[in-house]
């Protein structure tokens, strides 16, 4: 969306129907579950506008009731797959609690990919993993202790030399901003920003982003991840 999406506030619905962009089966390409077969449920709408975001989460008109959505997930999921990833947009913008509970009741694992700024009362515990990619200075304080891993998008020349993490705003290009930093002991993943299709940055490229992410991991002990699905040219 490259920062052109409307910033939508939390949806007041009860979760018995959700606005969904798409449901698809692929390999999880990022973070702690990288390489694992997964059904992705991409929720529509986001409360932020990240200037480099290349994901379409606004073009769908599909708002299925929960039983219909569960049936579609079941139809996409082969027997070898037990992981469902809720992504966006921002999944916690909507009341995803009923969906998460239904998936856990089926014996499935659920991962939520979130920017961490919104809170929902979820069935935290075994089977549910929260992976946060901070895009702002602060996160919801109730959510922070529930986060299982942090993931940061790294671009060359845009990191803080003291910790190797982003030093520029995601909402206002070029503005210095220290994004939320992870608490001690929580796994941190760094991955290079994919600048394909974004406005050119003179003297910088995707190879530079990868080199900076790798250097950050080596110096500070983070875990480097690359977008496996993009390397394989799959969804």
Swiss-Prot record:
Question: Which EC number(s) does the record attach to this protein?
Answer: 4.3.99.3
Q: What class of enzyme is it?
A: lyase
Q: Where does Mg(2+) bind?
A: 55
Q: Which UniProt keywords apply?
A: 4Fe-4S, Iron, Iron-sulfur, Lyase, Magnesium, Metal-binding, Queuosine biosynthesis, S-adenosyl-L-methionine
Q: Which GO terms describe its biological process?
A: queuosine biosynthetic process
Q: Which CDD domains match?
A: Radical_SAM (cd01335)
Reaction(s) catalysed by this chain's protein: 6-carboxy-5,6,7,8-tetrahydropterin + H(+) = 7-carboxy-7-deazaguanine + NH4(+)
What molecular function does GO assign, one term? magnesium ion binding
Q: Where is the Radical SAM core domain?
A: 33-235
Indicate whether Lyase appears among the record's keywords.
yes
UniProt cofactor(s): [4Fe-4S] cluster; S-adenosyl-L-methionine; Mg(2+)
Which residues participate in substrate binding?
27-29, 42, 87
Binding sites annotated in the UniProt record for S-adenosyl-L-methionine: 89, 133-135
**InterPro entries cross-referenced by the UniProt entry:** 7-CO-7-deazaguanine_synth-like, Aldolase_TIM, rSAM
Pathway connected to this protein: Purine metabolism; 7-cyano-7-deazaguanine biosynthesis
Q: How is the cofactor bound?
A: Binds 1 [4Fe-4S] cluster. The cluster is coordinated with 3 cysteines and an exchangeable S-adenosyl-L-methionine.
| Chain positions recorded as [4Fe-4S] cluster binding sites | 46, 50, 53
Per the entry, what this protein does is: Catalyzes the complex heterocyclic radical-mediated conversion of 6-carboxy-5,6,7,8-tetrahydropterin (CPH4) to 7-carboxy-7-deazaguanine (CDG), a step common to the biosynthetic pathways of all 7-deazapurine-containing compounds.
Q: Which family does it belong to?
A: Belongs to the radical SAM superfamily. 7-carboxy-7-deazaguanine synthase family.
PANTHER family of this UniProt entry? 7-CARBOXY-7-DEAZAGUANINE SYNTHASE
Q: How does it assemble?
A: Homodimer.
Question: Which protein, by its recorded name, is this?
Answer: 7-carboxy-7-deazaguanine synthase
Q: Which gene encodes it?
A: queE
